Amino acid sequence: RKSLYQEFHGSTIPDVGIGYLYVDSSSEMMSNDDPSWKTLGTSVQLPKASQLLITDANLTPRSDNLDSYPGLKQWLGSPDAWRDILNSIVGATLGGQKRRLGRFLFACKAGNYREQVQTQVKLLQQSGETDVTFHPVLGLAGGTGSGSVIDAVAQLRDLYPDSPRLRILV
């Protein structure tokens, strides 16, 4: 997004058929005044419709009642182990460097993710072009991105099974 803005020297960016969905377990880079989104003196921050914060997911009640969440139960593991993990979390930024915690957070917000992806695809397809290529871009340093990449791709493919027209490139 910053590169496009820089390439067009701050002018109106032509309709290039790009949609964004920024998913994170930290709200740090989601505020309108976040300096990392500034280029050429202008904020190119994504609108709220292109952001998904995956915190505040009531993880403890979910881990204590896994029978009600069969999709989580398959891979989450022991509720006792999760109680220890969840009790050790400090502050509101829940993801940190824990891959399974990233998966857990993402799983709790998968419905929101699906809705926001569908909104982005509809906006892109309004031009009449129905083919879409998804490019999940994420951090693999051991935090929530590396924990949820497979789940994000699986949700995309579940939503859009027509792989020749709706490609996913990771």
Region locations from a protein language model:
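Segments that form or flank anion-binding pockets
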Residues: 1-137, 147-170
